[in-house]
Curated annotation (Swiss-Prot):
Known role: Catalyzes the reduction of nitrite to ammonia, consuming six electrons in the process.
Entry binding sites for heme c 3: 91, 206, 209-210
Family stated for the protein in its record: Belongs to the cytochrome c-552 family.
Positions annotated to bind heme c 4: 279, 282-283, 390
Protein name: Cytochrome c-552
Keyword Heme belongs to the record: yes
Binding site for Ca(2+): 212-213, 258, 260
Highest taxon of the lineage: Bacteria
Length: 474
């Protein structure tokens, strides 16, 4: 990077910090009766919950999903997930992970970077605070870096609870939806939060983030595509009617959809959801202390880690028996996932070859639609974390339809390529590793990593300093 570029970056960083410092002069959230985003502010009234929440920091390891499955680099060619995709860690690391991922780039001022403000939406209770203070448009408008100094606390208390209520102050949970767009989504499926049962509310607060969503309008605001329902077919029809695409695929030129993490939607269709076994039953069980005190364990994690408090509350099988059942289902889903990936990856490269051979937009349109639908269905299944446990039958069925759609695309491509004089199989480059797949796409990973490291060293410390100054006035 040139000296000139570094100097310009330093000036931009200064401007970004000054913008953040100007925000510090605002009256504190507590004084205005707004959301307090600090998780430790609630330790005194909820000590057990807070201490167990802190234990989500124990999931230290970062698992590189692209290194584990390089096919995904090709499937997301031209989109941020081809740069970097790690498996989720504990809530404690939500801010660290979104700051560090290559997907958010290395912005040097409030107006640069590849992502919108919406990418903070599931990462911090500061989001609820900023929406409270500025309104939804005031939160969503602009680039991700615009309010970086405002988003300072990882996922915690004020994301799921009405921390301003008297009930919460007196030790009760008082669950709440803290994002207005989530309230609208539940109204769209005729399940307004205030009319939901206790069990439904326990699932709905998790659904604020563990769902499919997209960015819409000039501010790139978050919206759930539930207007026609929450099933894979219904959301596909919604997106098609809207003419929406997250991006255009770099190889096939297909108008693609990127499923986020529709865990709530797949859970609803599975055996647990249909029997009202909700998220907290398995991931945040009630536990008893030595003194007899019962509280909800906020160390969100694997149910097998607390088997007696989770699975054993309903199941009569032993831990080993249930683990074997889950392991078998996971292997079945993985096998179908890889089968779908092989077909969709091939379809992308074959579509790319068809374009190079002179195919027209009219000839390609139905093929690209098949590819779009195939990958949407694959992504819907694999992005639903824990789907092999929540709804394995749903995952297998949806992945089966992904294979079918990909086969439809490839059948049409064989015929089209033949009309262009191409009768030999289309060659697929070396994509055996993450690095090889990224190289095949011409991605400059060295540059991206350098930009990210510069951002982490020059911008993030100033964000943290500005946030600490603001919170010192609470």
């Amino acid at each position: 990077m040139s000296i000139k570029h570094w100097m310009a970056s330093s000036v931009s960083v200064t401007a970004l910090v000054m913008t953040a410092l100007l925000n510090i002069t605002a009256v504190s959230a507590e004084e205005k009766g707004l959301v307090d985003p600090r998780n430790d502010a609630f330790e005194q009234n909820h000590p057990d919950q807070y201490q167990s929440w802190k234990k989500t920091s124990e999931s230290v390891e970062i698992e590189d999903a692209l290194a584990e499955d390089p096919n995904m680099v090709i499937l997301w060619a031209g989109y941020g997930f081809a740069k970097d995709y790690n498996k989720a860690r504990g809530h404690f690391y939500a801010l660290d992970d979104v700051r560090q991922t290559l997907r958010t780039g290395g912005p040097q001022d409030a107006k640069s970077g590849p992502m919108p403000m919406a990418c903070w939406s599931c990462k911090s209770p500061d989001v609820a605070r900023v929406i409270d203070e500025r309104g939804e448009d005031g939160y969503f408008e602009g680039k991700w870096a615009r309010l970086g100094a405002e988003i300072a606390n990882p996922i915690g208390c004020a994301d799921c609870h009405d921390t301003r209520s008297e009930k919460f102050k007196n030790g009760e949970p008082e669950l709440a939806l803290t994002r207005p767009y989530v309230e609208r989504a539940f109204q769209a499926i005729n399940k307004p939060f205030e009319q939901q049962s206790r069990l439904d509310k326990q699932a709905s607060v998790c659904a604020q983030c563990h769902v499919e969503y997209y960015f819409t309008g000039p501010t790139k605001a978050v919206k759930f595509p539930w207007d026609m329902g929450t099933g894979v077919q219904q959301m596909e029809e919604y997106y098609d009617a809207l003419g929406f695409a997250d991006w255009t695929h770099a190889v096939s030129k297909a108008p693609m959809l990127k499923a986020q993490h529709p865990g709530f939607e797949t859970w609803r269709e599975g055996i647990h959801g249909k029997n009202k076994v909700v998220c907290v039953d398995c991931h945040m069980p009630k536990v008893k202390k030595e003194d007899g005190t019962v509280y909800t364990d906020h160390k969100v994690g694997n149910p097998f880690d607390r088997f007696e408090d989770t699975c054993a509350q309903c199941h009569t099988q032993s831990k080993d028996q249930l683990r074997e059942i889950v392991s078998t289902r996971k292997a079945q889903v993985l096998n179908m996932k890889l089968t779908a990936e092989k077909q969709i990856v091939a379809a992308h490269f074959e579509a790319g070859a068809a374009w190079k051979a002179g195919a027209t937009e009219e000839e390609m349109k139905p093929i690209l639609q098949d590819i779009r639908h195939a990958q949407w269905r694959w992504d819907y299944a694999i992005a639903s974390h824990g789907v092999h446990m929540h709804a394995p039958e749903v995952a297998l069925e949806v992945l089966g339809t992904a294979v079918d759609r990909a086969a439809d695309a490839r059948t049409k491509l064989v015929r089209l390529l033949a009309t262009k004089g191409i009768t030999e199989p289309v060659q697929i480059p070396d994509i055996s590793t993450k690095a090889a797949a990224q190289k095949a796409l011409g991605m400059d990973m060295e540059k991206m990593n350098a930009e990210k490291q510069h951002f982490l060293k020059t911008v993030v410390p100033d964000w943290d300093k500005a946030a600490a100054e603001r919170e010192s006035k609470y």
